[in-house]
Amino acid sequence: ALQAFHLTSLADRVCVDVGASTGGFTDCLLQHGAKKVFAVDVGYGVLDWKIRNDTRVVVMEKQNARYITTFHEPIDLVVIDASFISLRTLLPVVRQWLNAPKGEVVALIKPQFEAGRSETARGSGVIRDPEIHRAVLRQVLEFAQKEGYTAEGLIRSPLTGPKGNIEFLAHLIYPGETPADVERLIEGLPWNEGTTADQPGQPEPEGKLK
C-alpha cells in the first residue's frame, strides 16, 4: 500500500502503527526510512524480537488506540490494521495525533468488522456479497470525510484476511481540503476480479507489503 499510495520515502517522518501485532507494518515503515514508529497493540509479547529492539521503534503493548489522546510529538503518518473494532471508532481519535498541515493515514478496511451483525452472521464471519463491500466502503469513506479527512486513494488489499475475507486499503489526508468522489474511488476497484471469499486467508509475511 505504501507504494500504491506513493509513500515510499518516509525520511524524518514519525509514524504510528495501530494494531502492530508481529510488526509487519512497522517493518515496512522502517524499510521506507521512517524516523520513528510507535508500535501500538492491545496484545503483549507478539512483536518480533528484531523489530522490538530497533532503536527507532517505541513499543506500546497492552494499549488500546481508541483511548490514546496524544503522543509526546506530532505524528506524520498513521497505519491501521485493527481487528474487532470499526474504523469509525478509531478515525476521530487518530486525527488528534496528526501533524498539521498534512497528516496521512493508511487504513485497512475490514468489511467483517464494519458490516452489521446480520450481514456478518450470514457468512459465518465471511463477507461474500460485493454489494456489502461497496456499502461498507461508502460508509467508512463518507464518515472519514465528515470527520475532516479527504479520501486520497483506495485499493483492494493484495492479501485476504481470516477465512479469506476480502479487505481494502484507504489512503486518507487530514486535514482534507476538497472531499473526494467516494463513488468514483469505489467503482474504480477491480470488481470484475471477483469478491467471493473461497480460500482461507494467507498468513502475512514478514515485512508485509502494505
Model-derived features: positions:
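Conserved S-adenosyl-L-methionine
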Residues: 28-36, 100
